[in-house]
């Protein structure tokens, strides 16, 4: 039983794979880099690695020291999972089991569930024997250890091999029944550190206890001693991101439905024009080369005829009223004119035909790079160049739908989301507040297509795509990566060094390249598109049009949105009839440290949407009715969150792959390669020279520097002369 267990390294990737080999689902291990910062998210337990002190190096004996913090009550000790370590080199598995088997809401799998049920009520010593007699645990443990050398160095008689090297030990910090316990398999009793404060989490107290322990061991030195290492057992972030993505995609569909419903109420004539437009699609699909230049100008005439009389094409969009959207569908199509053409003259060449993508990809530019947008702007593709009118002041309570309808999506590449006028030439303006309305009859068609794509996106299993396609029109996960901020090579960095959710010193390449982080240019580009570039105008528009984002943004990824028949959009308040527990139950489980409040809320709202029975028990909170501009701002917020979680999920998947690569490098046996390489050197006649060179270098390096500068004193001892044979 006590033979064959190998020593494991303190690596979060190794522990994560070990958890999977145990059969546990939904759990991973992260490394803690900073004890001063608060832990984000739920934590099941801490695994602390420290250097084993001299008088306790014998790993085969359990320490019998007892102090005031030791729990000697057999009922308390036997009801928790606390096992004595009776096997050398098994402290890593003991520490991991001490965390997992003391959590009530973790899917342990068949192996650990059987272990927990079998050892229920056992003494710590009996539980230690149970671990030693579990071949599944030993096999999983040794599968992630480095191979032992074939020939061990000769041992001195009476000296243990453990004493010849530095020994490190793992212990666990776990919250049980509202109190923080330290579970050390080499101690006879668990250590009770007491309860934590009402206004703090159990992790805060655990960090204080660990910092005090490190401070005592290092005699007050800074708390970054390399002899210590701390890891946290946390929920699997892949499940969290997948659940968030599901909720966000459902909410995206709800926002699109609300936007479509609002347009149907405010612009009922668009439904009729949409039907007539579909009947005239064959006429519009004719090649543009068959039309004369006069025919191209005729397509623009109805738009300009209803505007205020102007002298040139540069003032067309300056004062168009809302009635421009009521023009017949056959004449409302705008065509991009070459820069050299004029309104009254015939262009020298026909207008170029712009290759159009599908409707949802053509204008759904939330994830489009701003550099690409500027290139299109410089090339004259998709935007017209007309002077800007100064923005007009308006009151806070007026509902100017002429200004708010500007951001509705359109299939025409010549009309995109226009930013508000800031006094600079080159941007479009409206008669209401300096913007061109893009609410055209084919807006309903675009929203219908997006609703269909959103429904398809919900029905398809979640997968990570590195390029935008028909299945995910709005999500473009970046494939490029930036190097780590520290001078390191990604091929040599372990996956645990690349990034961690707990204040990692190295940043993930995918997160560094994520375009939807708060400081990214895409987020600022979206805000510029919505609210303009002027700071004062930005503040005013944030108050006016960012109301939906301010109200629903905090819960957009954790709760479902409810759309009423009257267009009121509100979050759902889940009752206790759902699968999740009530707040009181949640708080009691939170005292055990393994509740996972954030993840449970997400699971609750997801199941309430998937299951009709749970959906009926959900009650919508008081909501409000938002304008089209506010709904579009909320839609862009949802799209940014989706892109963000797609990138985070892709990062977790890539990190898990690197965990496996590091594990293969760690457990691979290089003896055969080394033997083959040495034999090849011997065949080439190079081995003898290399051995002589290395031996001579070692001899020169082995001379003490102090002896080189030491003055030699004359030897005054009398030396005997060599014996010479007398001649006979």
Swiss-Prot record:
Which top-level enzyme class is recorded in the Swiss-Prot or TrEMBL entry? hydrolase
**Which residue intervals are annotated with compositional bias (Basic and acidic residues) in the record?**
597-613
Task: Domain (ULD): give its ranges.
Answer: 669-697
- What residue spans carry the region label Interaction with BRCA1? 595-720
Sequence motif Classical bipartite Nuclear localization signal (NLS), location on chain = 698-721
Family label: Belongs to the peptidase C12 family. BAP1 subfamily.
Q: What is this protein called?
A: Ubiquitin carboxyl-terminal hydrolase BAP1
The species this protein belongs to is Mus musculus (Mouse)
Task: From the UniProt record, report the name of the gene that encodes this protein.
Answer: Bap1
């Amino acid at each position: 039983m006590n033979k064959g267990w190998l020593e494991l390294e303190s690596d979060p990737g190794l522990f994560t794979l070990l958890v999977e080999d145990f059969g546990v689902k939904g759990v991973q291990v992260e490394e803690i880099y900073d004890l001063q910062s608060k832990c984000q998210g739920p934590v099941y337990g801490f695994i602390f690695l420290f250097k084993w002190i001299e008088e306790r190096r014998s790993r085969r004996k359990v320490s019998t020291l007892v102090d005031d913090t030791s729990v000697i009550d057999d009922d308390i000790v036997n009801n928790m999972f606390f096992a004595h370590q009776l096997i050398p080199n098994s402290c890593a598995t003991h520490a991991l089991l001490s965390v997992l088997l003391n959590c009530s809401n973790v899917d342990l799998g068949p192996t650990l569930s059987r272990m927990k049920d079998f050892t229920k009520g056992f003494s710590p010593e009996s539980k230690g024997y149970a671990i030693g007699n579990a071949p599944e645990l030993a096999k999983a443990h040794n599968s992630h250890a480095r191979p032992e050398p074939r020939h061990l160095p000769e041992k001195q008689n009476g000296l243990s091999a453990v004493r010849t090297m530095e020994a490190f030990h793992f212990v666990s910090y776990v919250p049980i029944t509202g109190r923080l316990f330290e579970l050390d398999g080499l101690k006879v009793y668990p250590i009770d550190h007491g309860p934590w404060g009402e206004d703090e989490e159990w992790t805060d107290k655990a960090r204080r206890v660990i910092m005090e322990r490190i401070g005592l061991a290092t005699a007050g030195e800074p708390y970054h001693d390399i002899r210590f290492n701390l890891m946290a057992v946390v929920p699997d972030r892949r499940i969290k991101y997948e659940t968030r993505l599901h909720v966000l995609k459902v909410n995206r569909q709800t926002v699109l439905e609300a936007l479509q419903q609002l347009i149907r109420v405010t612009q009922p004539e668009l439904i009729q024009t949409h039907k007539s437009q579909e009947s005239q699609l064959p006429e519009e699909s004719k090649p543009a080369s068959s039309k004369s230049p006069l025919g191209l100008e005729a397509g623009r005439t109805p738009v300009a005829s209803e505007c205020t009389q102007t002298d040139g094409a540069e003032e067309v969009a300056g004062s168009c009223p809302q009635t421009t959207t009521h023009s017949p569908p056959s004449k409302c199509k705008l065509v991009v004119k070459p820069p050299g053409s004029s309104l009254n003259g015939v262009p020298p060449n026909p207008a170029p035909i712009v290759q159009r993508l599908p409707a949802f990809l053509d204008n759904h530019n939330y994830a489009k790079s701003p550099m690409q947008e500027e290139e299109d702007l410089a090339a004259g593709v998709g935007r017209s160049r007309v002077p800007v009118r100064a923005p007009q002041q308006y009151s806070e309570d007026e509902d100017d739908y002429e200004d708010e309808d500007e951001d509705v999506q359109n299939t025409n590449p010549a009309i995109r989301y226009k930013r508000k006028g800031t006094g600079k030439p080159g941007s479009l303006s409206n008669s209401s507040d300096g913007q061109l309305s893009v609410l055209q009859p084919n807006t309903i068609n675009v929203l219908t297509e997006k609703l269909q794509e959103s429904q398809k996106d919900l029905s398809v299993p979640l997968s990570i795509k590195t390029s935008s396609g028909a299945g995910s029109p709005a999500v473009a996960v970046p494939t490029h990566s930036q190097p780590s901020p520290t001078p390191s090579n990604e091929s040599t960095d372990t996956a645990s060094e690349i990034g961690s959710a707990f204040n990692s010193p190295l940043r993930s390449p995918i997160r560094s390249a994520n375009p939807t982080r708060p400081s990214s240019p895409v987020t600022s580009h979206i805000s510029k598109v919505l609210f303009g570039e002027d700071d004062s105008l930005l503040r005013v528009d944030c108050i006016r049009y960012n109301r939906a984002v301010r109200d629903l943004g905090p819960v957009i990824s954790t709760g479902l949105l409810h759309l009423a028949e009257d267009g009121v959009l509100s979050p759902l308040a889940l009752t206790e009839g759902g699968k999740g527990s009530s707040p009181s139950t949640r708080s009691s489980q939170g005292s055990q440290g393994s509740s996972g409040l954030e993840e449970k809320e997400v699971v609750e709202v997801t199941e309430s949407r998937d299951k009709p029975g749970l959906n009926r028990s959900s009650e919508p909170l008081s909501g409000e009715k938002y304008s089209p501009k506010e709904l579009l701002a909320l839609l862009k917020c949802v799209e940014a969150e989706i892109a963000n979680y797609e990138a985070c999920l892709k990062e977790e998947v890539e990190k898990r792959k690197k965990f496996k690569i590091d594990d293969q490098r760690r457990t691979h046996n290089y003896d055969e390669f080394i033997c083959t390489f040495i034999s090849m050197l011997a065949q080439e006649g190079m081995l003898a020279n290399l051995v002589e060179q290395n031996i001579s270098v070692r001899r020169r390096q082995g001379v003490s520097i102090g002896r080189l500068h030491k003055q030699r004193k004359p030897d005054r001892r009398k030396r005997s002369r060599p014996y010479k044979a007398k001649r006979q």
